[in-house]
UniProtKB/Swiss-Prot annotation:
Protein function: Produces ATP from ADP in the presence of a proton gradient across the membrane. The gamma chain is believed to be important in regulating ATPase activity and the flow of protons through the CF(0) complex.
CC annotations in GO: plasma membrane; proton-transporting ATP synthase complex
Protein's UniProt name: ATP synthase gamma chain
Presence of the UniProt keyword Membrane in the record: yes
Any Pfam family the entry gives: ATP-synt
Organism the protein comes from: Lactobacillus delbrueckii subsp. bulgaricus (strain ATCC 11842 / DSM 20081 / BCRC 10696 / JCM 1002 / NBRC 13953 / NCIMB 11778 / NCTC 12712 / WDCM 00102 / Lb 14)
Subcellular location: Cell membrane
UniProt signal peptide: none
HAMAP family: ATP_synth_gamma_bact
SUPFAM superfamilies: ATP synthase (F1-ATPase), gamma subunit
Subunit organization: F-type ATPases have 2 components, CF(1) - the catalytic core - and CF(0) - the membrane proton channel. CF(1) has five subunits: alpha(3), beta(3), gamma(1), delta(1), epsilon(1). CF(0) has three main subunits: a, b and c.
Amino acid sequence: MPASLLELKKRIASVKQTSKITEAMHMVSAAKLNQTEKRDKGYQEYNRLLHQTVSRLMSASVINHLNKANYRLTQDNIDSIDYDDVFGMGIISDMIKPREEVHSVGYLVVTGDRGLVGSYNSSVIKQMMSLVADDKLQGRESKILSVGSVGSQFFKKNNLNVVYEKDGVSDVPTFKETLPIVSTAIKMYLNGVYDELYVCYTHHVNSLSSAFRAEKMLPIVDLDIGTMEAKESKKIEFEVAPDIDSVLATLLPQFARAEIYGAILDAKTAEHASSMTAMKSATDNAKDLVSSLSLQMNRARQAQITTELTEIVSGANALE
């Protein structure tokens, strides 16, 4: 067999072997995606109910405190509430009261531990660098808590301030597994390491689509504090022992931990979807390449056969 045909045959065999590997990786990613989607769906329902509970308890507590002070709460003066005056100095005020000045911002950035996931890692890093640049323009310090070795290596290589890093989060993370991560992030905020905490990650929309998110986790700002009338209607739905503030002091840190874990789980779901899409694309490209190489090999064979037949006919004519 001529060298060109032999080379084409080897390339076809190599590409076929590669396509088998990428197809297997596609199936593995699809299985992991199915697991994380199921867990994420169930967890989102839990998180929704927890958010609803904390929001209503907070509304009831604020009203109780303000009623004692004969303070009329309206939609116009909600933002002027001083939570230190309402709750006193403590965990509740620490979790929900914005700092007077924001000198540093913490970013818990979720990336993967490996490649072969399409643009999953690069898009998060690109958006993160944009946030860091904005902080620099505003005179704020950016402090990064990195989850995932791809992000950790990039941020340290580019001399960013990485105050915490964690690699090797499992493909289907549990709340218990991520508890050290989220607890450290919250503790750093309460200790004044940074004045705000954001979680930056890729949100899973569906198998073919995802979107970058930078969600503010601390101070907690998305509790439903509406008009006084709305809160009064919510207040009667709970009978709390020993008292609302004691329950809130326990629930608010748990609420923050739940929000951060939900973001990490969402990011892992997006990672598996991106990996599945990338491996399917690689498999399809490999199959197309095999078809193209096979066509080249067939043409080369035809040319070889034509040449050999021509030589045979020419030799026979020469003998006559």
